[in-house]
């Protein structure tokens, strides 16, 4: 893991666990997210459209076995689902602003169920301009939600009602590569979801994107 991002992530975890450093921890979280966002934006400036569909590690195991377009989709679908359906209990940005049609996506899920050539085919269908609009909007809305949370809310568990709501939306595929996400998220408290979905998950997939980029443009 990138040393700078890793250190920031560790700092976030330490700071948000204590009430007297919680606000500082949220500031550190936003700093990390801004740094990672700069990398994701750089792809739009530096890469050709077809580069977003490239899958140079198609037979590998790991986050780098995807495409850059898929990775961006995946990061922000998960964030949107977790932030709105599970934490804020309101409508996802994806549905509120008609992003399935705007992005031209054949799916509404996180994409965990897709493999190999399916990932490439999926990536090629996406409207990148709208995909980037989506990520900006999700990032902003998530950060508004995080700012509204008090330290005491971090230990709040996800209710059974929320879990059933999540299932009913069909935003997580029933495929074995995806369905585990529902229990994984719903067994965490709000603090755990913030530390994974809004920070560490970003790091892992952004690093994978850089690995893909460096492979296709050595």
Q: Residue ranges of each PLM-predicted region?
A:
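Short, contiguous alpha-helical
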Residues: 1-11, 54-113, 140-143, 147, ...
């Amino acid at each position: 893991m990138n040393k700078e991002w890793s250190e920031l992530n560790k700092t976030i975890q330490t700071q948000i666990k204590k009430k007297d450093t919680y606000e500082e921890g949220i500031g550190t979280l936003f700093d990390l997210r801004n740094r990672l966002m700069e990398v994701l934006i750089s792809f739009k400036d530096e890469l050709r459209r077809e580069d977003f569909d490239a899958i140079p590690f198609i037979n590998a195991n790991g986050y780098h076995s995807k495409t850059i377009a898929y990775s961006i989709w995946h990061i922000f679908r998960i964030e949107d689902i977790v932030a709105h359906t599970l934490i804020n209990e309101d409508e996802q940005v994806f549905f509120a602003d008609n992003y399935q049609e705007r992005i031209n996506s054949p799916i509404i899920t996180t994409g965990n169920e897709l493999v190999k050539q399916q990932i490439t085919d999926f990536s090629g269908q996406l409207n990148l301009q709208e995909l980037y609009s989506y990520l900006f909007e999700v990032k902003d809305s998530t950060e508004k939600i995080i700012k509204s949370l008090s330290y005491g809310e971090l230990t709040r568990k996800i209710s059974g009602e929320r879990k059933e709501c999540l299932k009913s939306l069909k935003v997580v595929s029933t495929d074995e590569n995806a369905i585990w996400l529902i229990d994984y998220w719903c067994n965490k408290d709000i603090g755990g979801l913030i530390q994974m979905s809004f920070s560490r998950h970003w790091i892992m997939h952004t690093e994978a994107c850089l690995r893909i980029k460096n492979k296709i443009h050595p």
